[in-house]
Structures are given as C-alpha cells and as structure tokens.
Amino acid sequence: DELSAFIDGRLFLPDHSVIVTDDDADQSWFDLAAPVVDKYHVLATSFMITAYRQDPPPSTYVLRRSHTHDMHKAGANGKGEMVNFTADQIAADLETSAGVLGVKEVIAYPFGHYNDTAKQGVTQAGFEMARTVEPGYVTIGTDKLALPVQRINYGMGLGALESMIG
C-alpha cells in the first residue's frame, strides 16, 4: 500500500497528495459522491459498517474498507465500544468485518475513539493501519494506528478545500 510505504519512508508522494475517504458508507455518499469519483476516476475509500451494509461498491473507484462490523455504538462509559471492549473482542469484530469485505488493511475508528487496547485489537486482527478523526496530516513516521485527517463536510466550498489541502 502506498500510504504505508510513504509512512515508512519507502515511497515519495508529491506535496498536496490526498486520499479521499468516506465514513459509514451512507447512501447519500453513494448517491452524491460516488458518481463524481467515477466520472473523474478518483480512487476513494469507503469505510463501511458491515453489520448495516454489505453491498458491493458503487464504483470500481471505491474501495470498501472496515469501519468495524458492529461496534458503532456507545459503550459503558458513553464512548464508543472501541474503547470499552477488550482487544480480543475488538479483534473478533474486525475479523467479522474483514470476512465480509475480503480485505484487511485499514479501519476507521468508530466516532474516532481509540486507545492502546483498541490499537492492540486492530493489530491482533491483522490490520496495519487505523484512521482517527483527529485533524492533521500524515507524514513520514506517523503512527499507522492513529492516522489523522482533514475533514470535509457537506456544503464546504472549493475555497475552503483548497486552503485545507494547500
């Protein structure tokens, strides 16, 4: 994977490189964004909650990846189950998700919640990377189990996007 190789310093990526992702694989993203991705041949990653959605990708340019199987819920402390479960429970859920999607590579933490136990569960399940909701940029040496993002919200204008990317 190019992102992993970049983080390891084994691959050069040009400045202002982006990875387009979607959380939850919501139908609105499939209806509104997937046609744009398809039209412009932009590879995108859709993080799917596989307990709720298992259909094929809406385009050959959309890669389905795990947003867990069924951990998109509040746990005992009000935060996501990802920070309430044991590493074994997390790994079991991610194994189920990987079985549906047919791939282990990267997950998106539900609600962006994670801790060391969550990281252990992700690794135990055989995933290499995990994406947070923390703002930031991926650089060489970034923690692969705590990848930051630049969040783009519905209705955000082109100017805001340009200033975010640089």
What are these regions (language model features)?
Residues 133-134:
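Beta->alpha turn/N-cap motifs
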